[in-house]
């Protein structure tokens, strides 16, 4: 059992070596005396593929978490940079929402309670009133989906 009076300190995944698997990463987090690690699901194919991890892969990570006492309470989800929820392209918006669903289900399976997401409607496209409208509509859907899994969506502060 964790000491509720202890200050918990975590580390962002991208501050750790990239060339190790998740079980090794979790052990390293523990060795470095951190209590938790934040996982990144960015716009790269490699990290987006995590949303399709099998139950066996997830169970292997769960075992490492239990064995070490390390947690993964949050996800930085920036896959929407490449596939924005406010895109003028309907196919891109559909992909964005597919990724959002996968991220929520993945979070639920992993025990992740919070998904930080970008607060912009589009990134590589020109923003407009229409892209903002699409983003707002899709964000409302995403909030409903997340709430049904008891996952919190938070908007990351953007420059």
Set out the residue ranges of the language-model regions.
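Residues that cap or flank secondary-structure elements
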Residues: 16-18, 53, 95, 134
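Active-site acidic/histidine proton-transfer and metal-coordination neighborhood
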Residues: 3, 23-24, 66-68, 83-159
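Active-site beta-loop-alpha junctions enriched in small/polar residues
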Residues: 12-16, 40-44, 77-80, 120-122, ...
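Structural motif corresponding to alpha-helix initiation and N-cap regions
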Residues: 19-23, 55-59, 90
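Boundary/entry segment of secreted carbohydrate-active catalytic domains
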Residues: 2-20
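Hydrophobic residues within beta-strands of alpha/beta enzymes
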Residues: 37-39, 73-75, 115
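Glycine-rich, proline-tolerant flexible connector loops at the mouths of alpha/beta enzymes
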Residues: 38-66, 119-126
């Amino acid at each position: 059992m964790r000491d509720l009076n202890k200050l918990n300190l975590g580390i962002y995944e991208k501050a750790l070596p990239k060339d190790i698997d998740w079980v090794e990463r979790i052990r390293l987090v523990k060795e470095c005396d951190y209590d938790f690690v934040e996982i990144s699901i960015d716009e790269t194919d490699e990290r987006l593929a995590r949303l399709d991890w099998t139950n066996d892969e997830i169970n292997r990570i769960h075992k490492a978490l239990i064995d070490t006492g390390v947690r993964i309470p949050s996800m930085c989800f920036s896959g929407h940079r490449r596939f924005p929820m406010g895109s003028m392209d309907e196919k891109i918006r559909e992909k964005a929402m597919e990724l959002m669903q996968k991220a929520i289900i993945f979070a639920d399976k992993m025990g992740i309670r919070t998904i930080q997401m970008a607060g912009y409607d589009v990134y590589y496209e020109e923003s407009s009133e229409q892209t903002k409208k699409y983003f707002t509509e899709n964000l409302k859907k995403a909030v409903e989906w997340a709430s049904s899994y008891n996952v919190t969506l938070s908007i990351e502060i953007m420059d």
